[in-house]
Amino acid sequence: MTKSELIEAIASKQPHLAHKDVEDAVKKMLEHMSETLANGKRIEIRGFGSFSLHHRPARMGRNPKTGEPVALPAKYVPHFKPGKELRERVNSSRHQAPLRSQ
């Protein structure tokens, strides 16, 4: 699901809200979440999951074309850990219907 599809789905289920208001709310929420992670803070949404940063230490990699060693700097990467309710819901729905390939 893309951001546009999410906005459409919410707007169709909430006809009393203007489409533009739904779009603004989704964009602001995602922007705030990005800023929070960029500031090194954790986000926890009970029943859904938590977003945090994981540290990846510096390492030596290889250029796939030349095979030359390349120094890769340390970095932080976003990480999502699903909550118990989300895991259970996903697992129960997977047993009922096969996954659709896109």
Curated annotation (Swiss-Prot):
Any one biological process term the GO annotation gives: DNA recombination
Biased composition (Basic and acidic residues): 82-91
Protein name from the UniProt record: Integration host factor subunit beta
GO cellular component: chromosome; cytosol
Homology family: Belongs to the bacterial histone-like protein family.
Subunit structure: Heterodimer of an alpha and a beta chain.
GO molecular function, one term: DNA binding
SMART domains found in the cross-reference section: BHL (SM00411)
Annotated NCBIfam families: hip (TIGR00988), PRK00199.1 (NF001222)
Record keywords, A-Z: DNA recombination, DNA-binding, Transcription, Transcription regulation, Translation regulation
Domain of life: Bacteria
Biased composition (Polar residues): 93-102
